[in-house]
From Swiss-Prot:
Binds 2 [4Fe-4S] clusters per subunit. One cluster is coordinated with 3 cysteines and an exchangeable S-adenosyl-L-methionine. [4Fe-4S] cluster 2 binds at C59, C63, C66. The lineage of its organism: Bacteria, Bacillati, Cyanobacteriota, Cyanophyceae, Synechococcales. InterPro entries: Aldolase_TIM, Elp3/MiaA/NifB-like_rSAM, Lipoyl_synth, rSAM. It comes from Parasynechococcus marenigrum (strain WH8102). It is found in: Cytoplasm. Its EC number is 2.8.1.8. Its cofactor is [4Fe-4S] cluster. [4Fe-4S] cluster 1 binds at C33, C38, C44, S274. This is Lipoyl synthase 1. It comes from the Bacteria.
Amino acid sequence: MLKPEWLRVKAPQRERIGAVADLLLDLNLNTVCQEASCPNIGECFAGGTATFLIMGPGCTRACPYCDIDFDKSVRELDPTEPERLGEAVARLGLKHVVITSVNRDDLPDGGATQFVACIEQVKQRSPLTTIELLIPDFCGNWDALATVMAAAPHVLNHNIETVPRMYRLARPQGIYERSLELLQRVRDDWPRAYSKSGLMVGLGETDDEVIDVLRDLRTHRVDIVTIGQYLSPGPKHLAVDRFVTPEQFDTYRRIGEEELGFLQVVSTPLTRSSYHAGEVQRLMASHPR
């Protein structure tokens, strides 16, 4: 299936990309931009931003839509990773940083303490930087969630990824209701935090199912939603079922913001969960907590 015109990405600024990539290489850090083959890597690297991927690069889950390598082996966490991440944030001069991770189901707390260590390093080295976490479901370990939230990230993101009907195919180790519960707990127990979630379209869902997911997310008090086109990483991954038009993406946005009352819905074909995440700062300023 050929990509439509609206999914073509502008050529990146090689000099700026090289500078960011060199810094990440120098500090031995992974980014989801690189590991997940994000289509926005040129724009984000050119803007001096990146979403850091900790505890990887291998993931203990093998979701068939994802380009991150599967690795079920038990691996020790790197105690120097948080310090190196904090240094990168300071050297890049980031106003807003996104920290995500692979799934680490081999760890009792799913890696919660590593998230906390990273938050502490960022706050120490770059105290004015706002912090957004994109976390896994911790297999429903709510103590692990509490550990992370006690470190006071400004934004807590957990992606719902797809509609419930597609979970068995696309996210076999995930549970739709568990992800909703996680998002609800964030807003109920830590009301000053902004909650965020995202989903892909083009996996085989219908537009009505997408709207139903938006309703579920709003019912569970989610503040911010991102919606983007699924692009298959390769022949061993799930195929694209359809290319959703920019007009339909705008319909999702309009329904989410105007009818359901989300603080923000970022919905375009190339949107990914941390795409233009720095705009969250403006949202926080206009809706302070």
